[in-house]
A protein has these predicted regions:
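A domain-level signal for the structural core that forms small-molecule/cofactor-binding pockets
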Residues: 2-72
């Protein structure tokens, strides 16, 4: 039984986006393994509060990460 865990910032995804993410991850995994596993593939989406992430020894929030992505 495959298990995939995804961690995202708290409140980053809507409930609908989370549902789509779970479906697409399941589809991607079963496309390379076995369609028979679709019914037993677990996807866990864990929301991590902003500030509880760290890179290079520095605690980061969602705004910090967005700035890094934007190249600021």
């Amino acid at each position: 039984m495959p298990l995939v865990e995804v961690k995202v910032f708290e409140d980053e995804l809507t409930r609908d986006q989370t549902r789509v993410l779970i479906q697409k991850i399941t589809d991607a995994l079963t496309s390379v393994t076995s369609v028979k596993l679709k019914g037993v593939t677990w996807v866990i989406v864990t929301e991590v509060p902003s500030g509880n992430w760290g890179v290079g020894g520095v605690a980061l929030g969602l705004d910090d990460v967005n700035k890094m992505i934007a190249g600021a």
